[in-house]
Amino acid sequence: MIKNITPQEAWDKLENDSDTVLLDVRTTMEFEYIGHPVGAIHVPLMEAPGWQTDPAFCEKVRETLHQSHDMAPEDLTILALCRSGARSGTAAELLTTEGFKSVYNVIEGFEGDRDENKHRGEINGWRYHGLPWEQS
């Protein structure tokens, strides 16, 4: 079962555990233009226009983490993040199935849930909570 973590809990974990990484699984366009958490590693789960899960997603995560960390990628704590927590939940399940031992889904995501006016970023999410982020 995938563990859920709030954006604030995720930031605290990142600040206090050097074996924890934040994995942003949104599309490249979202990551670059909407913004992303400072220090996040980016490996898209899917891209437009097909919007199909990348069959090489787990291997790409493994390769990316292997290049940036001294320990085995499977032994790192991974905090998966997307726009609102849905795609990152799927990513977390895939990574767990592929042998990653400690994977969390960052609920609320980067932009958060939609409010009554269908706007994101007004009720929750990484940016809403004032956590560090940047744009490319």
Predicted regions and their residues:
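Short, surface-exposed ligand- or partner-binding patches at beta-edge/loop junctions that are enriched
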Residues: 81
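Rhodanese-like catalytic fold shared by cysteine-dependent sulfurtransferases
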Residues: 1-21, 28-77, 88-136
